[in-house]
């Protein structure tokens, strides 16, 4: 399996999960501006939408969209929490959490909009605060991770998104439970290794 990624982008979540499952994989960095990979390949021939992540499951077989990729990797692992049974409430809860990660992604993604004016930046910060307040309400003090005692793909995705605030020097640590979740995820060996492999550490 090959992961096409951009350092620090949402593809970092898939990178963390690949490290968690402990099966062989390879990495290929993508320049999303030029749509070229580090080996000089035309990325649009791999993913016509030009976004990361994408995984090449086998030659010519490519999967895109982070939520789908995270679930696919989990389904092909030996980790029970990564692959709740299809049709179960646990699977629906994982999909629900990944769906909310998409909402977080949209809000935080505004931080990277080109030519962001002061007014636009204020609006982005307000959107982030609104989503983070919603996220905070989802997290229970009695749970180790988002969905319970087990680490899941949703934890990795949410933690990566919150890390974008660090990149942009936006303090969101007052969202106490959410920030504690991020810190817990980033302390995992799988996350530390992914940061090193992407040149972020």
Region locations from a protein language model:
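A generic structural-conservation signal
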Residues: 27, 174, 194-195
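GST-like domain detector, emphasizing the conserved glutathione-binding G-site
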Residues: 1-122
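GST-like fold's C-terminal all-alpha helical module
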Residues: 89, 96-97, 101-189
